[in-house]
């Protein structure tokens, strides 16, 4: 949408708005963005936006698997509850028994993934925004000051798996998850991040250098081959773009120029 605004391409803008609403975006998400809000106001598109939302949102709601959504929400809440209790609280204040608490949480997250989450993925596909609800990811501003540090998606299953792979694990689910990438249910970046956690905390050495990274140059060729297989850029190119983006974002913040295409969800 932002690119359509920059290019002043009304046809493309309406097309992206329709696609966005069909994927779960709300009108307020558009007007929260200063660049898009100005374009809507300038071209008096408010009625068109609201009309398109009424039509497309019905299609979106019909596409949601509410039973799966409810189950994933419950699993995420269960994981979060016990992670906070055992890892973030008890293991911090009672460090002498840290190993006991880590093992206790390990048994809980293992049950959540092995017994509940994996069968759901096998049956329905990876539960992300494509088949369950899309969420606003970020902290909403409590003041009149605009907040640009947000994104959209559904990261609940992702977080569960990151917690799961923070312990030593084998490769039992690697192919299942990779197949979900090829099916379009799981973003390559998320799969690569999960595998990086597995590589960091297990004896398995199959880094993608998406989240955790190895500095061993002898492994770079194999890493980029794995990245290419799932549609990711070489990690060196990704890192260069990230650093270039950081520089641009810093300049935008210092100049307080927010009416530009956002490079990252945290880039105001």
Give the residues covered by each predicted segment:
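Preference for long, solvent-exposed alpha-helical segments and helix-linker "stalks"
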Residues: 2-154, 161-168, 176, 180-182
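Stable alpha-helical elements in mature extracytoplasmic
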Residues: 113-116, 173, 219-226
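Short, composition-biased local secondary-structure segments
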Residues: 1-9, 189-197
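Long amphipathic alpha-helical coiled-coil segments
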Residues: 185-186
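Short coil/turn segments at secondary-structure boundaries
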Residues: 32, 130-136, 189-195, 238-240
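A cross-kingdom marker for long, charged
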Residues: 191-268
């Amino acid at each position: 949408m932002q690119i359509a605004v920059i290019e002043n391409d009304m046809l493309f803008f309406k097309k992206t708005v329709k696609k966005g609403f069909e994927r779960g975006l709300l009108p307020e998400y558009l007007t929260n963005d200063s660049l898009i809000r100005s374009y809507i106001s300038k071209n008096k598109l408010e009625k068109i936006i609201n009309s398109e939302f009424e039509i497309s949102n019905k299609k979106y709601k019909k596409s949601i698997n509410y039973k799966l959504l409810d189950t994933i929400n419950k699993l995420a809440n269960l994981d979060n509850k016990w992670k906070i209790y055992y890892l973030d609280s008890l293991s911090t204040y009672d460090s002498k028994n840290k190993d006991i608490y880590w093992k206790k949480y390990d048994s809980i997250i293992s049950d959540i993934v092995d017994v509940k989450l994996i069968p759901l993925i096998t049956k329905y596909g990876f539960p992300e925004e494509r088949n369950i609800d899309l969420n606003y990811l970020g902290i909403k501003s409590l003041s009149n000051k605009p907040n640009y540090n947000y994104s959209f998606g559904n990261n609940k299953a992702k977080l569960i798996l990151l917690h799961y792979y923070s312990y030593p694990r084998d490769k039992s689910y690697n192919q299942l998850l990779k197949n979900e990438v090829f099916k379009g249910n799981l973003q390559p970046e998320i799969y690569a991040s999960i595998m990086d956690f597995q590589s960091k905390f297990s004896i398995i050495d199959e880094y993608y250098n998406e989240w955790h990274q190895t500095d061993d140059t002898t492994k770079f060729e194999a890493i980029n081959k794995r990245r290419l297989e799932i549609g990711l850029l070489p990690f060196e190119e990704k890192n260069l773009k990230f650093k270039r983006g950081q520089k641009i974002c810093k300049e935008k913040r210092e100049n307080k120029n927010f009416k530009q295409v956002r490079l990252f969800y945290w880039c105001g």
